[in-house]
């Protein structure tokens, strides 16, 4: 089970990423555009660097919804492998069956 502070930190990162998403995209578009001047690119880079570090989506970590575990996370279900197995054995995930051959 992950610490509550780690879960809260991830929640804060998601909120910041949503808050600054449009600003970040606009600045990145200016930086990548071949039609913008060097001065505009430079200013956009400086503004990007002044944004909060946690507002970048690459700082986020996928975590299990039930336990907050960061490793062995399965995107399709939003759970870690252990919690997915437990839920599958209880029959809580429709269409998911244990493999046998």
Curated annotation (Swiss-Prot):
Pfam family name, one: Ribosomal_S14
Gene Ontology annotations for the cellular component aspect, listed alphabetically: cytoplasm; small ribosomal subunit
GO biological process, one term: translation
Keywords: Ribonucleoprotein, Ribosomal protein, RNA-binding, rRNA-binding
GO MF annotation: an example: structural constituent of ribosome
S-S bonds: none
SUPFAM superfamilies (alphabetical): Glucocorticoid receptor-like (DNA-binding domain)
PROSITE patterns documented for this protein: RIBOSOMAL_S14
Protein family membership: Belongs to the universal ribosomal protein uS14 family.
Subunit structure, interactors included: Part of the 30S ribosomal subunit. Contacts proteins S3 and S10.
Described function: Binds 16S rRNA, required for the assembly of 30S particles and may also be responsible for determining the conformation of the 16S rRNA at the A site.
Full protein name: Small ribosomal subunit protein uS14
């Amino acid at each position: 089970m992950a610490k509550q502070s780690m879960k809260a930190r991830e929640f804060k990162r998601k909120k910041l990423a949503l808050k600054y998403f449009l600003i970040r995209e606009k600045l990145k578009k200016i930086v990548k555009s071949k039609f913008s001047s060097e001065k505009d690119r430079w200013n956009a880079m400086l503004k990007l660097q002044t944004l909060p570090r946690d507002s970048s989506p690459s700082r986020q970590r996928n975590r299990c919804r039930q336990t907050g575990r960061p490793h062995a996370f399965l995107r399709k279900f939003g759970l870690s492998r252990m919690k997915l197995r437990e839920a599958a054995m209880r029959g809580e995930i429709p269409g998911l069956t244990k493999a046998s051959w």
